[in-house]
Design a protein with these regions (language model features):
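N-terminal intrinsically disordered, cationic/polar leader segments
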Residues: 1-93, 97-124, 128-130, 134-135, ...
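A short acidic/small-residue loop/turn micro-motif
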Residues: 143-145
């Protein structure tokens, strides 16, 4: 993408709820790039790092979040790659590419909302995830971003 971008600070909280298991929250703060694509259309890019539980190796994924008032798309490129599209009340089917093989996946969006501001913004998702045709989890993702010029701070803890 050859558009000009704005550096942003990103605070992301993701929670997965599995049957008969405790909630699994993940929160991190990172830096990224914000691309304004229109008054109600933006894209954020950042790198996500996670440690492989078996090998201890750090794996990086390039994340691209494209969001508008009607749709949020998450594209992940790296060792684990996929595309997920979220729109209220709709189901999206795709493929989850892993080093161990490919798996069919589907998401059913229960909530998808975003706010695009000139110096800050947020997006919120609540969805059900199925892998290989089986219900896997109910997930929630809340992301806040701010530019250096924003007077508002990114909250260190995001209330659910």
């Amino acid at each position: 993408m050859n558009q000009e971008h704005t550096p942003v600070l990103i605070n992301l909280l993701a929670t997965a709820r599995y049957d008969r298991m405790p909630e699994v929250p993940i929160q991190f703060i990172t830096v990224g790039k914000l691309f304004y694509r229109g008054p109600e259309d933006a894209q954020i890019q950042y790198v996500e790092s996670q440690q492989d539980e078996e090998t201890g190796e750090i794996m990086n994924s390039d994340i691209s979040l494209t969001f508008s008032k009607d749709k949020i798309t998450i594209q992940r490129q790296g060792d684990f790659s996929n595309t997920m599209v979220f729109s209220n009340g709709k189901r999206f089917e795709g493929v989850y590419h892993t080093p161990y093989g490919e798996m069919d996946m589907a998401v059913y969006t229960r909530e998808a909302a975003c706010r695009i501001g000139s110096g800050d913004g947020s997006l919120h998702l609540k969805y059900q995830l199925s892998i290989q045709g089986n219900y896997t989890s109910t997930n929630e993702l809340h992301l806040e971003y701010k530019t250096d010029g924003s007077k508002k701070g990114v909250r260190k803890g995001i209330k659910q």
